[in-house]
Design a protein with these regions (language model features):
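Binuclear metal-ion centers of metallo-dependent hydrolases, dominated by the metallo-beta-lactamase
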Residues: 16-23, 100-122, 203-251
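Active-site metal-binding loops of divalent metal-dependent hydrolases
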Residues: 39-41, 59-60, 86-87, 133, ...
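Structural motif
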Residues: 36-37, 56, 82, 149-152, ...
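Core dinuclear metal-dependent hydrolase active-site scaffold
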Residues: 4-50, 105-186, 248-251
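Metal-dependent catalytic neighborhoods of phosphoester/phosphodiester hydrolases
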Residues: 66-75, 93-96, 228-235
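A short, acidic, amphipathic alpha-helical segment used as a generic capping/interface helix at domain edges
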Residues: 174-180, 198-208
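Short active-site oxyanion
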Residues: 15-16, 34, 77-81, 216-218
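Active-site metal-binding motif and surrounding structural segment of the metallo-beta-lactamase
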Residues: 41-88, 180-191
Length: 251
C-alpha cells in the first residue's frame, strides 16, 4: 500500500496506493482499478486511462458530494458512479440526455443494508455492501480482487454536548449496532471519521471500529484540517500506531 506516508502491503500481497485528497475524499488505486470516495474539493491526481474508475458518494452533504465528479466520465473512458439514493442527480441526468449521453447507464443508486455487484471491465466482480449511517446516507464495504476496503462516510459515534442525553444514548446504540455487523472481519484499508468537534468524545468512533475490525491500515478523516487530532489519537493509543496513518495535510 503506497501513500505519501509510506509503503506497505495489503494482506493478500497486492499493492495499493492511497491518496488523501481532502476531508473525507480519498483515491485508492489497485493493480486493476481506481476507487474515488466522497470527493468535494482538492486536486484529483491524473489517472491511468487504461484503468476503470468507480466513484463513490456516501451521502448528499456538501462536504461529501460535489457534482463536479460527473465531469470525470468526459476525461476517462470507463467511469461508474455509486451514489446514495438521496443524492440529487436528476438535473445531471437531464443535462447529459440533452447532450446524447446516457448517464444512467454509468450509475448505481444504493440504499442502506444492501449488497450490490458491479461487473468490471476485466470481468471481475466488485461487491459493494452498504451500512446504515448514523447521520446521513451509507457507509461502503468493498470486496474486489481479494482486497477489502471500508469507507465510513458519516457513519460514526456522533455524541454532541448540546444534544439531550437520550439522543446521545440512541446514537451510541445505533453506532454499536452497525459495528457489530463488521465484527471479526478483516479489511485491508479503512477510512473512518475522527472529528475534533466532538471534543472528549472525538476518539470513540475510531476506538469502537478498531475494537471490532482487524484493519491493515486506517486513515482517519473528517478532521476539518485539524490534523493534530490524529497524532494525539496515536499518542494516546500506541497499540494502533502501526495501523493508524498520521496524515499531516491535504493532498
Amino acid at each position: 500500500m503506497n501513500s505519501d506516508r509510506g509503503k506497505g502491503l495489503s494482506q493478500n500481497g497486492e499493492i495499493m496506493r492511497v491518496t488523501f485528497i481532502a476531508h473525507s475524499g480519498f483515491l485508492v488505486e489497485t493493480a486493476s482499478a481506481y476507487f474515488l470516495f466522497d470527493y468535494f474539493k482538492g486536486e484529483i491526481p491524473e489517472l491511468d486511462q487504461k484503468k476503470p474508475l468507480v466513484v463513490f458518494v456516501s451521502h448528499s452533504h456538501r462536504d461529501h458530494y460535489n457534482p463536479v465528479v460527473f465531469d470525470l466520465f468526459e476525461t476517462y473512458p470507463w467511469v461508474h458512479y455509486v451514489l446514495d439514493k438521496d443524492c440529487g442527480i436528476k438535473w445531471k441526468l437531464r443535462e447529459c440526455a440533452d447532450q446524447g449521453t446516457d448517464l444512467a447507464a454509468k450509475l448505481t443508486r444504493v440504499r442502506k443494508n444492501q449488497t450490490y455487484e458491479l461487473t468490471m471491465p476485466d470481468g471481475g466482480t466488485l461487491q459493494i455492501t452498504t451500512l446504515r449511517s448514523t447521520d446521513a446516507g451509507v457507509a461502503y464495504l468493498l470486496d474486489y480482487g481479494g482486497l477489502r476496503i471500508y469507507h465510513a462516510g458519516d457513519l460514526s459515534h456522533w455524541i454532541w454536548k448540546d444534544k439531550p442525553e437520550d439522543y446521545n444514548q440512541r446514537m451510541a446504540e445505533r453506532y454499536l449496532r452497525e459495528m457489530e455487523k463488521l465484527k471479526g472481519i478483516t479489511v485491508d484499508v479503512a477510512f473512518v471519521p475522527l472529528d475534533p468537534r466532538l471534543l472528549q468524545d472525538t476518539p470513540v468512533g475510531l476506538e469502537v471500529f478498531l475494537e471490532h475490525v482487524q484493519a491493515g491500515k486506517v486513515f482517519p478523516m473528517h478532521v476539518w484540517e485539524k490534523f493534530s487530532v490524529i497524532q494525539r489519537f496515536v499518542k494516546e493509543h500506541p497499540c494502533y500506531r502501526d495501523i493508524v496513518v498520521c496524515l499531516s495535510g491535504n493532498g
